[in-house]
């Protein structure tokens, strides 16, 4: 049996953003419970879900003892993360969207990540999940690599130094990088924070086995709510080349010229 004390994180707030996927949220929270994984507090930030999900959220808040932060209408990802982060009271934030499920190994790696961020005042983020490996990595230890970036980095996907995918960060994140822009599509919101992270010289670690530590689940009855423009996913070779050239130019321009998210 797992030792409960080993999986207790009193200095970490679990922040979960939610929209119309209460079954997925319940699955996530049950998974942490099954792993004997507990936090200093749990914040669930809802983005104006349908009434049936709000009713379920209120039931779940009693079962799992979390602070439910709501809004009267859908305001987008930026507002949802901002108001959730504003409700956090602990020193560190584990940010996860509701459609993820941690593996049995997750608590021990979260413990490692917490140790790293506690002992390195310059470390801003530890990432646990991605669709593919960050292009610029150097060895840190057996399980983690250090992300790095410089002005001569030629890969356009260098901007994903930051990602909205599951990560541990300091709860003072906004002080260094600014708040998430509001009123925009989710992918644009994330993009602007990616740029801000680079502009403000963020520092982060990346979990090497990123596809297996925590998995994303989107059942048919609760599909992903993130929609991206079709041309960005077009398999046509010419379209891909045009897209890559466009991204290389735009991303580098934005790193240099985009207005800072910091007020």
Whereabouts are the PLM-identified features?
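N-proximal low-complexity "stem/linker" segments adjacent to membrane-targeting elements
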Residues: 1-30
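Glycine-rich, basic loop-to-helix element that forms the pyrophosphate-binding segment
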Residues: 28, 72-87
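A short, conserved alpha-helix in the catalytic core of glycosyltransferases
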Residues: 110-111, 173-178, 185-209
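Conserved donor-nucleotide/metal-binding helix-loop-beta segment in metal-dependent transferases, i.e.
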Residues: 105-125
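Conserved donor nucleotide-binding strand/loop of the catalytic core
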Residues: 59-76
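A conserved acidic beta->alpha catalytic loop
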Residues: 46-55
């Amino acid at each position: 049996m797992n030792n409960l004390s080993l999986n207790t994180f009193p200095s970490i707030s679990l922040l979960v953003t939610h929209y119309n996927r209460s079954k997925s949220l319940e699955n996530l929270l049950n998974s942490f419970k099954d792993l004997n994984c507990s936090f200093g507090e749990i914040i669930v930030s809802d983005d104006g879900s349908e009434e049936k999900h709000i009713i379920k959220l209120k039931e779940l808040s009693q079962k799992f003892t979390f602070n439910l932060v709501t809004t009267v209408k859908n305001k987008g990802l930026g507002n949802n993360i901002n108001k959730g982060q504003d409700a956090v009271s602990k020193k560190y934030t584990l940010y996860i969207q509701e459609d993820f499920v941690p593996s049995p190994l997750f608590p021990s790696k979260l413990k490692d990540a917490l140790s790293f961020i506690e002992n390195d005042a310059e470390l801003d983020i530890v990432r646990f999940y991605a669709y593919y490996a960050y292009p610029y990595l150097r060895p840190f230890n057996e399980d983690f690599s250090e992300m790095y970036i410089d002005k001569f980095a030629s890969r356009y996907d260098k901007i994903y130094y930051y990602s909205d995918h599951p990560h541990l960060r300091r709860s003072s994140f906004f002080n260094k990088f600014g708040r998430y822009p509001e009123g925009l599509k989710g992918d644009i919101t994330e993009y602007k924070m990616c740029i801000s992270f680079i502009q403000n010289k963020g520092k982060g670690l990346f979990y090497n086995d990123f596809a297996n530590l925590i998995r994303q689940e989107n059942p048919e009855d609760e599909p992903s709510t993130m929609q991206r423009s079709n041309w960005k996913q077009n398999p046509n070779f010419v379209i891909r080349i045009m897209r890559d050239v466009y991204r290389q130019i735009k991303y580098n321009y934005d790193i240099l010229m985009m207005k800072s998210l910091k007020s």
